[in-house]
């Protein structure tokens, strides 16, 4: 049976001893929680069950908290830890960890499964450092039944116009979600908030991920990007204090202060967002694509699954934008079982393994002919490829060695603004000053 453990940084030093006789096994430090963990468990179980896998090469999984994950990982790898053979890596952090990792040959079939462009998300300086397991971007999830009822009700449209005029200074008409601007989405969220509209059939219009966590900034920042926002200009000047960023930050605060999102949203991230939307009391949610499998599964989200609609994030003055990055698994340079680790990653890059990973809730970016084999079960993976190609972006400077500290800085300052601990001017000034230090040439 597959073993897995949740660990903290202090516990990593004890892993070698705690594994005992299993020291020869392939230990995998994965991404904790969510569909990525679920899918990794499934493929590891399947791999271990194969008759051709020696006991010394069977996989064991390790997990620790998302908070500070990459800093902990870097500290471990820089210290020469051999507590894990395989570790998580991401497009935006490969350069940070490449010197601590071993390039891997995934075999000739990997390109037939993922395609060269996806394989490149796990490459650095022309070398392959991992197998791409998940492509991450964001979907706008919404309740089809609620939106359909709004669009069909003249009285509801009148109420919607009144609410939008109060909050945006202009009356807006309800639209189909695929035609939403960010103002349209916000007006819809306000309409479905009982604090704003006591006649709303649900309690909240949306659920915002506002915890002081860098990944929440990745979700939010598409509002700024859609309005032309970026971290830096072509000359390397920090451009964070811009109308695009101000508009995006103010929009979230407006919704939060109005009660369109739960008051404890300041502690929300991925799991809390899924739970809130899945409860049936939320009309919309900007959430990672990985949530699609759970939110559209009647067994996991019975209150909403049959009525979940999915579109790309709304448009701003510069069009639509969707943050994108890849997650994968690579080999620790100090791994105790490099041959066993390479075998597991090579297997993970096969079509059968990729399809199992997808069926188990993961979100691999697959070539069309491979994705077609799972389109009925996972239509979101087809959508994933479409949105990535049309709206995907990476902020200028967001693949640098200090990308994570920048995201952490933004999370701290922007959450401070949303929670009322500092003004918008203070938050942007502090962020700009910090980014100028972190991203200086």
Predicted stretch roles:
Residues 26-43, 64-67, 136, 211-214, ...:
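Extracytoplasmic "Venus flytrap"
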Residues 89-141, 145-154, 183, 216, ...:
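Hinge/lid segment of periplasmic solute-binding proteins
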